[in-house]
Regions:
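Catalytic cores of enzyme domains
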Residues: 1-146
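Hydrophobic alpha-helix feature that most strongly marks membrane-spanning transmembrane helices
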Residues: 118, 129, 133, 189-193, ...
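A detector for short metal-coordination/catalytic motifs
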Residues: 130, 134-153, 179, 189-190, ...
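Alpha-helical adaptor scaffolds
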Residues: 145-178, 185
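Amphipathic alpha-helical scaffolding segments comprising HEAT/armadillo-like alpha-solenoid repeats
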Residues: 162-166, 193-205, 224
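Alpha-helix N-cap/helix-start positions at coil->helix boundaries
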Residues: 174, 178-179, 194, 208-211
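Structural detector for internal amphipathic alpha-helices that build alpha-solenoid repeat scaffolds
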Residues: 181-193, 213-223
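C-terminal/domain-terminus segments
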Residues: 202-209, 214
Length: 224
């Protein structure tokens, strides 16, 4: 842009900028906000990352995309915790994506709902009819199987150094290893993985973090 307009002013932002990424995308005509709270575009469905670049160049404004979810409430009906309250609104305190990133104890109700999820939840995207036929694969975002679906037991006592070297390049690593380890313990309970009992006992007895110890004790009770 600066090659064509040398004196242009540019400001880019994403996620934590002063503007709402979703509102900007809607006004740019890229899509509309669905009942699941995602911007839904004809080309990508909900499977997109949002960001914007502000420039001091006058453009003709785009027309907003005139579309909607109609009477469809599949995402609301299928949300595991009832976090979607309709019309694109979300109770974040109940959202599994949020819960898997917290660092504290989880209520039993949410431990059961999380199941085998280590980080995040895509249920409201996976069930959305607007995503049918959308290719969610991208050549620049291809993860190795052991990264995409890691073995659970090795996560339990993974060092900070090992965690950073293995997962540090992923967005999900920003919260550190503690939530991932807690979620791995919950997943082992979900799978009733009896072979993990020795490792869970080791964690329950010797891990210095009370939350991890408590979750391990709970998991042992669920498995046995």
């Amino acid at each position: 842009i600066k090659e064509k307009v040398p004196d242009v002013e540019i400001q880019s932002m994403v996620d934590t900028g002063v503007l709402s990424d979703r509102a900007v995308a809607e006004r740019a005509g890229l899509g509309f906000t669905g009942r699941n709270g995602f911007v839904i575009s004809p080309e990508l469905g909900t499977w997109s990352y949002l960001g914007e670049m502000l420039v001091s160049i006058p453009f003709e404004p785009d027309d907003p995309l005139l579309d909607s979810c109609g009477d469809c409430t599949i995402c609301v009906d299928r949300c595991p915790t009832g976090a979607l309250v309709g019309n694109g609104q979300l109770n974040s305190q109940k959202c599994i994506s949020f819960l898997t990133q917290t660092k504290g104890y989880l209520q039993d109700e949410y431990r059961y709902k999380i199941g085998n999820r280590l980080y995040g939840c895509d249920t409201c995207q996976q069930v959305c009819p607007k995503n049918r036929g959308i290719n969610t694969q991208h050549d620049d975002i291809v993860l190795e199987p052991e990264i995409l679906k890691p073995r659970l037991v090795p996560l339990l006592q993974m060092s900070n150094k090992k965690f950073k070297s293995t997962y540090g390049h992923l967005a999900g690593a920003w919260r550190g290893k503690k939530p991932i380890q807690r979620n791995a313990i919950i997943a082992l309970a979900h799978f009733k993985e009896e072979s993990a009992i020795p490792e869970l006992k080791e964690v329950a007895l010797n891990d210095p973090r009370p939350m991890i110890r408590g979750t391990a004790y709970w998991a042992i009770g669920q498995i046995l």
